[in-house]
Each structure stands twice: as C-alpha cells, then as structure tokens.
C-alpha cells in the first residue's frame, strides 16, 4: 500500500479514481497541531495495509475545501475520510482517528 501527498485538484481526481478499485483513506492534517501529530501516527501505522492520500492544510487549504464539497463531509482537522467508489463511507477527526478503526472500515468495504 502507499502514502501519497496531494497538492492539486488533479491529485484529488486520481485519489477518487483509485477508490473505484478499492477503498482509500484521505487524511487531512495541520503541520502545527498536536492533535494532528497524534492522528498522523495512527495513519502512518495503517499505511502498510491501506492506500492513504494526505494533505497538509497549511499548503493545500483550497484542496481541503474541495474534498469537503466533493465528498459531502464537514471540514475538520485532523480528519481521516474512508472513500470507496468516489463516496465518503465514514469520516473521523481528532482522537477518533485510530489505525484499527480505519483498517476495519476499509476491509469491510473492500
């Protein structure tokens, strides 16, 4: 599996295209937030089993808004969104972001 950094709308398109084949996780986080640092550890541990597409909010704020709009989820940070077939199946923020929870939701929708 992989960890991919998104910067552009084309990167988001590629992530949503990838979700047509198998569920993915979109991970949005801040480079300066302690909650983001904890969530990033959980997501990093899951990267061996899940394709993850991440953005750093300080560098991709507009892309974060597009993700919220296109997936019809409220913006949060940090936030992990499980996506399958271009649709959000679930989204988690702050302390809700747990490696096992992400793996279980992805496996249930594979």
Where are these regions (language model features)?
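A structural signal for the main folded, soluble domain(s) of proteins
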Residues: 11-12, 34-40, 56, 69, ...
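Thiol-based oxidoreductase modules, predominantly thioredoxin-like and allied folds used
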Residues: 6, 28, 50-66
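N-terminal "domain-start" segment that seeds a small globular fold
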Residues: 1-13
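Structural micro-motif
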Residues: 71-84
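Non-catalytic, surface beta->alpha helical segment in thiol-disulfide oxidoreductase systems
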Residues: 82-110
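Short cysteine/histidine-rich metal-coordination sites, predominantly Zn2+-binding motifs
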Residues: 47-53, 101-103
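Local sequence-structure signature of Cys/Sec-based thiol-disulfide redox active-site neighborhoods
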Residues: 14-46
